[in-house]
Amino acid sequence: MEQTWRWYGPNDPVSLDDIRQAGATGIVNALHHIPNGEVWSKEEILKRKAIIEAKGLTWSVVESVPVHEEIKTQTGNFQQWIDNYKQTLRNLAECGIDTVCYNFMPVLDWTRTDLEFEMPDGSKALRFDQIAFAAFELHILKRPGAEADYTEAEQAQALEYFNNMSEAQIQQLTSNIIAGLPGAEEGYTLEEFQAQLDRYAGISKDKLREHMAYFLSQLMPVCEAHGLKLAVHPDDPPRPILGLPRIVSTIEDIDWLTEKVPSKMNGLTMCTGSYGVRGDNDLVKMIKKHGERIYFTHLRSTKREESNPMTFHEAAHLDGDVDMYNVVMAILDEEQRRAEVGDHRLIPMRPDHGHQMLDDLKKKTNPGYSAIGRLKGLAEVRGLEMALKRAFYTK
């Protein structure tokens, strides 16, 4: 696997020098300063590429080129946004970047209720609390129809949870959910947020699938002409939330996506932390079945909590519910299969997220993206990979 690291650009508190010292060789980056939907010019791409390469690193993967909301709803200027997206892909390819991660999640990117969940060892992790989220939907946002998404027991627990919240806690929970996260342009007031949700009224899972298939059908000729691979990131969490449809959550969703848009340029990001939240997702089976379409991997683990099967926190990389041993073995099997047919390029892998720990507890960090937790995760995965390669792949 190619060892990569997500970098949020010049304003990231983790520097390129830090990243190189961590042992990564590839950078995962995006031009976050360009508004969603606007074309990334070659000038801007090359400027960022030069900054990365000046430190002896390679811009390996773009994560992400954001998909404008009007593309997802097929409203407004969606065709113009698609045309802009195509031009951005052309520009990236002509600048030597050939792998682009993206997602098709409506309104929100990855969603958590707690960005500073304290672990038993004192480190801090990201967490999704089903009851806290229900309290937000039912009693803070007051989304019409939200009751249908929760059991009576969950509704009662959510009311108790809400009644025990201070005003500061209400504001913090709201901010965690709707104010946007690193790499996301969106940040909403409650009223604006509900208005965004309302845009999806009447858009079912099947309809959103139609919109995604149309989007990809428009992009594939550009991707094929330039050898540029798209790698869709799964929904996070991988289930419907806020009354919104989700269409990249299960192996059945991947089956549909690869059958509907069969081009080899229509690929996947295997994010074990996202897919792994669902107990019914067999990650190794997913990798073995769709390995040839995996162009990017995010390796992290989550732990479902006993209090509620929908509640989870982000575990250490080799802990939690993800069987990282067999996941890495399956990825190495795919790399070997490719090598046997002449494709020796390693699959880019980044240690996704990481606990805030040690000296980073005293610093301002991007949620999930502090340096030391990811350094630990990368070192652990690197060691696991080396052991597997020497035991099973050295001839």
UniProtKB/Swiss-Prot annotation:
Function (record text): Catalyzes the dehydration of D-mannonate.
E.C. number(s) listed in UniProt: 4.2.1.8
Reactions it catalyzes: D-mannonate = 2-dehydro-3-deoxy-D-gluconate + H2O
Species for this entry: Vibrio vulnificus (strain CMCP6)
Enzyme class: lyase
Highest taxon in the source lineage: Bacteria
One of the protein's GO biological processes: D-glucuronate catabolic process
Involved pathway(s): Carbohydrate metabolism; pentose and glucuronate interconversion
Entry protein name: Mannonate dehydratase
Family note: Belongs to the mannonate dehydratase family.
GO molecular function: ferrous iron binding; manganese ion binding; mannonate dehydratase activity
Needed cofactors: Fe(2+); Mn(2+)
Keywords: Iron, Lyase, Manganese
SUPFAM superfamilies, A to Z: Xylose isomerase-like (SSF51658)
